[in-house]
Amino acid sequence: MSKTLSDIRVKIDKIDDKVHDLLMERASLVSSIAEAKRKSNLQMVQPAREAKMIRRLLARHNGPLPRQAVVRIWRELVGAVALLQTGLTVVVFADEHGNPHWDMAKDYFGSIVPMKKINSRAGAVGAVRNDETSFAVLPWPELDQNDAWWVHLFDQHSEKMSILCALPYGSHGRKSTQNPTHRSLVVSKFEFLPSDDDCTFLGLDLRVSVSRTRVVDRLAEHGVTVVNLYSSKSSARPDYNAHLVEARGYIAPDSPLLDALRQVFDADCRYCGVVGGYPAVPELDE
């Protein structure tokens, strides 16, 4: 072995030791933050801050290490420390056609956080509602379907569930993930907060006489940029259609926009509210 190669390996070993020291120091600091959050009754999980952190790291990143690897490394760090802080658990929807959502969930939550499969969409939402799990990973909405799972987020009383994150998280960017079978949404009782670059989901329950075109037009008149509009029908509610609006930007649950929309749709509207959203992560497609 050449002296040069040996010297390089010695340097790498020293770097590994430094990295490990910093990881241990980081974990200790995060634990201190967790304790302060508990004393102040603050939200333990902060997807908005995590998204800002990833954006900051990717903005300064250079060299041969793939950007996707940076995301995976820091997601693993966040997941591991979060488990130590709160004992988080995850359920992932899976049906007879397989489970494309499992790998996405594992990439986001990390290899340490306990995860289990569930074969019912409503059961996954119910597990969050009943505090049986911290997060549920569910299929991305379809443009038109019956009895969609996301309708369970409408008109809640004390549950306070919301969509918190979109998956895959910085894996290959949106260009290669437009197929809804390869995308997922995360539901939790943690609050969806602004990260400065977000999409919000608005829930609307409207009479069937209100067309999708009218919905989009009225939203546009009130400054809402619609990314997608998903609709759901139910045999139990034949006179109403539920709509899930994927809108650009952060919309607060108490935004005056919601009252304005209720007035626009008037008697045709049975529900109008924010049901969560997701922070954007920079594209990783090169």
Task: Specify the residue positions occupied by each region the protein language model found.
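Domain-level signature for soluble enzymes in the chorismate/prephenate branch of the shikimate pathway
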Residues: 1-286
